[in-house]
Amino acid sequence: MIKDGEFGAIIQRDKQTYAVAPHIPCGVVTPEILRKLADAAEKYQAAALKITSAQRIALVGLKENDVEKVWTDLDMDKGAATGLCVRSIKACPGTAFCKRGIKDSLGMGMQLDKLYHGMEMPGKMKMGVSGC
């Protein structure tokens, strides 16, 4: 049995299936990333695709034997979803996409992500950037 957090997998309530949530800096995805996620979800019969509060997209309900195969197919960073570290940095659209944006929150969030994502800390740390 995979331990919680091992191989970037999180055990689900049923204690038999897992979720994986690739690192998606500031929640910004491309059509290619969405296709990869959808293709993996179909191929490995994920129970659901779930948008997380950390602006990631989780493939939920995966079989233990499929976890490593999913990561190989996705070819994406596992990111820091568990442990005592800086988790995914969240950001609003800011001036890039929002008419109310007055600051480049996505740009700042991406910079913070490059600098701090996954950095070990005494406790889990979450960051958010607002541009309005």
Where are these regions (language model features)?
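Small-residue-enriched alpha-helical segments and adjacent helix-cap loops
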Residues: V20-G131
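N-terminal basic/disordered segments at the start of proteins
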Residues: M1-I33
